C-alpha cells in the first residue's frame, strides 16, 4: 500500500475510534479488532461484538512503551526484568504487568494486572502513533469461528461495512506469546 493510501486508511480509522467504535487491522499473526482503551462505551461494544465477558481482561498494543505507562505499574520491575521485556519489544511477546488502581476494570477484568505489547507491525505502529495512545486488541473473529487472516475474512465475519484498515498480517502462524512481567511465567505459548 502506498503511503498516501495508508495515511488515508489510518485517518479514517482514527475517525472511527473517536466515535467510540471498533476497527479491524492486521497484526503480527492475524487481524485484530480494537478500540479506544479509555472509552468504556467502545470497550463494551468490542466485548459485545466478540461475545467476550468483561471479567477476562484485555490486551493493549502500542507503538512504544511510553504509550503503555499510564495503564501499568512498572515500579516493581528489576533492571533484569526490564532488560528481558525490552529485548522482546517491539515484537510478538505480550507481558502481563501489575495495573494501578486507576486502570479501568473494563480493561483489567477480574485481575489486578493488564496484558500489554509493543507491536512491531508497521501499520499498527503508525496507527497507534497517529492516535497517540495504545489500542485494545483482540483477535478478529466471532465466537466459535477462526481468527481472520485477511480483509476478506474480516468482511465475511463482521460484514462488508465493518471498518477495516487494509494491509497484510506479519505472517506469524501463532498468536503472541504471553508472559508475566515479574516472574517470566509463560501463560500462552507463541
Curated annotation (Swiss-Prot):
It is an enzyme of class 2 (transferase). One of its GO terms (molecular function) is ATP binding. It catalyses: L-threonine + hydrogencarbonate + ATP = L-threonylcarbamoyladenylate + diphosphate + H2O. It is found in: Cytoplasm. One of its GO terms (biological process) is tRNA threonylcarbamoyladenosine modification. SUPFAM superfamilies: YrdC/RibB. It comes from the Bacteria. Its EC number is 2.7.7.87. Required for the formation of a threonylcarbamoyl group on adenosine at position 37 (t(6)A37) in tRNAs that read codons beginning with adenine. Catalyzes the conversion of L-threonine, HCO(3)(-)/CO(2) and ATP to give threonylcarbamoyl-AMP (TC-AMP) as the acyladenylate intermediate, with the release of diphosphate. HAMAP family: TsaC. Belongs to the SUA5 family. TsaC subfamily. This is Threonylcarbamoyl-AMP synthase. It comes from Shigella flexneri serotype 5b (strain 8401). The lineage of its organism: Bacteria, Pseudomonadati, Pseudomonadota, Gammaproteobacteria, Enterobacterales. The gene is tsaC.
